[in-house]
């Protein structure tokens, strides 16, 4: 029994080292990109996330069509007793097409070990909610109820306080968008 636990712990440690190394390599690759290349990568990731959201989810697509605007963020979260993460994203007013590039960051303390990569999609019901998010930033204080079920399951969300929020992982849509403790703000370097 003790030997099995040691093997599991060793396997987990190796997996974390490999995952962390690849994450750090991706971060270095990101830093070497020029501003326009970063924008293009963010735009591509946002479109991929929106496409993934709409697959088998007509309610999300309907809310998107009714929305004033949207934002998509790509996040990498590391947890080793402490958790921290961050990422980049873009907010876009649907009618005008105007884009604002943004950042996100999160930190916390809790039980956890691993790396989690996911996208968060915000749909904004009206211009006031969208403009407040973009101009003033936003901090999530609690876990936001997001979508129902496993990959491909139809989301049952609607706008709440002017927003609908979805979290997409490699497993598909998640039952809750765990964005507590996450702050969103304008990326000064990418909006020049």
Give each language-model segment a name:
Residues 1-10:
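Bacterial N-terminal signal peptides that target proteins for export
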Residues 4, 18, 77-80:
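Exposed boundary/loop context
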Residues 15-23:
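C-terminal segment of classical bacterial N-terminal signal peptides
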Residues 26-192:
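Small-residue-enriched, tightly packed secondary-structure blocks
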